[in-house]
Every structure is written in structure tokens, then in C-alpha cells.
């Protein structure tokens, strides 16, 4: 499997993020059911932003990860100030992937 770490950037006090928050976990829940979501959550330092970690097939590329995340309500409603996709190698793999 190829693992991707995705950074979501947004202001902590964004009214749009707050409004869309119920729809975002629903989207992530579908990824979890499909076995693609490893974990996700906001950073707790008060600056906003979040990390999402997903797994796709060995041949998957960043473009594949971007396509998978394209329907996230945070993205489709332009609530994010940025998204950064990385391939990631969990060397000390405590995630079971």
C-alpha cells in the first residue's frame, strides 16, 4: 500500500469550516469504510489545520490521492486555504498498515 499524509490548512475560527464540519466526517467515514482512511484530526495548537492519512494501492500516485479527496466538502466548498499531499513512509509503523 502507498500511504499519503495530507495537510489541510484553514483558520481555526473559520465560520465556513465550522458550518461544514458535520459533512466532513461523513466523507471521511466513507473512506474508513472502504479501508482507505488510516487516521485524521485537527492539530490542537490553536492555529487551525489538520492532518489526514490515507492508504491506496501500491501503484497510487499523489494525483490519485488528490482525486480521492476531491469530493471532501471542505475542498468542494473552497473552505481550505490550502492542501498539501505527501507520500509517506511510516517507518515505525504503529498504524497496522
Residue ranges and their predicted role:
Residues 1-97:
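Conserved, structured core segments of small domains
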Amino acid at each position: 500500500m502507498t500511504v499519503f499524509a495530507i495537510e489541510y490548512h484553514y483558520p481555526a475560527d473559520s465560520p465556513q469550516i465550522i458550518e461544514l464540519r458535520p459533512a466532513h466526517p461523513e466523507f471521511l467515514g466513507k473512506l474508513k469504510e472502504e479501508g482507505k482512511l488510516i487516521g485524521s484530526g485537527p492539530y490542537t495548537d490553536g492555529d487551525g489545520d489538520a492532518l489526514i492519512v490515507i492508504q491506496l494501492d501500491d501503484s497510487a500516485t499523489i494525483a490519485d490521492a488528490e482525486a480521492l479527496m476531491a469530493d471532501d466538502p471542505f475542498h468542494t466548498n473552497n473552505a481550505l486555504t490550502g492542501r498539501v499531499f505527501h507520500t509517506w513512509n511510516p517507518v515505525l509503523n504503529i498504524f497496522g498498515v
